[in-house]
Design a protein with these regions (language model features):
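Bacterial signal peptide processing site
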Residues: 18-20
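Pro/Ala/Gly-rich low-complexity, hydrophilic intrinsically disordered segments
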Residues: 138-162, 167
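Sec-dependent signal peptide recognition
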Residues: 2-9
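Compact alpha-helical subdomains of small soluble proteins
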Residues: 196, 203-249
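Central antiparallel beta-sheet cores of small beta-barrel/beta-sandwich binding domains
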Residues: 32-124, 138-145
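Short, exposed beta-strand-loop hairpins at the edges of beta-sheets
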Residues: 131-138
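C-terminal motif of bacterial Sec signal peptides marking the signal peptidase cleavage site
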Residues: 14-16
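Amphipathic alpha-helical packing elements
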Residues: 172-214
Length: 249
């Protein structure tokens, strides 16, 4: 009996060790699931933001900003700014393998509204690839590759940064021809991310790396310096219209 009792105690001790060794294994599995969920959530947060690029593959297509503003479970919301239009969209986002796949639709009350289908790789959330199809036959379908880029106002970019950084004098503009004056004035708007409705204005700025279409209304974003400079430039544009070739250099 003296031998048996210590033997029983030893066996019970071994069983207790084996039971304890199994518990951490279950806890580890649970923590992996939690970490995976957190990783997915972080990936969702990483894809929120603006993606910018050419909307189409024809060589003369407009630059687009696609803004993902909200993700709630599998619901996604945002808006696009392109060709002078600012349109909302909403839809679904699902994880498939290494990608987030999005199907989203614009409201449908504009003749150029349509449906987006695009994907973002979980390991490269700086790039978005997809296509868009119009609801009506008012325009052609588009394919696109967009890159994450945050809009930031910078008064110092462009050919005529002085129009945003200091008050202009008459000597700054009196010898400029109308095309130069027009460019100087519209460059102020471009710095604020204004999405031009006129095709010729879009062509001037959309190939510039610093230009990011961000809004169709910039009235509340212009600085006091810029407002005064715009008024001065407009006056000289009117002079150029009146005097034609005799005006400017």
């Amino acid at each position: 009996m003296k031998i048996i009792k210590p033997l029983i105690v030893f066996i019970l001790f071994l069983c207790g060790c084996n039971t304890n060794s199994n518990k951490p294994e279950q806890n580890n599995n649970n923590s992996v699931i939690t970490n995976n969920n957190a990783e997915n959530l972080n990936s969702d947060e990483n894809i929120i933001g603006s993606y910018v690029g050419i909307f189409g593959q024809n060589g003369n297509d407009n630059k687009i900003t696609l803004l993902i503003s909200r993700i709630d479970n599998n619901i996604i919301e945002g808006r696009t700014i392109v060709g002078g239009n600012d349109r909302p969209f909403n839809g679904t986002i699902v994880a498939e393998g290494d990608d987030f796949r999005v199907n989203a639709k614009e409201p449908g009350d504009d003749k150029y509204d349509g449906e987006f289908n695009f994907s973002i790789n979980k390991f490269n959330t700086n790039e978005l690839r997809g296509n868009w199809a119009p609801f009506k036959n008012t325009t052609s379908a588009k394919s696109y590759t967009l890159y994450k880029k945050k809009f930031a106002y910078d008064a110092n970019v462009g050919i005529y940064p002085i129009a945003s950084t200091r008050l202009l004098n008459t000597t700054d503009v009196e010898n400029m021809v109308k095309s130069e004056l027009s460019y100087m004035r519209n460059e102020i708007f471009a710095r604020h991310g204004y999405c031009f409705k006129k095709k010729d204005m879009r062509n001037m700025f959309e190939l510039l790396d610093w230009y990011v279409p961000n809004t169709v209304d910039i009235k509340n974003f212009l600085t006091e310096i810029e407002k005064k400079n715009i008024s001065l430039i407009k006056r000289y544009e009117e002079y150029a219209d009146e005097y034609g070739d005799d005006y400017g250099r």
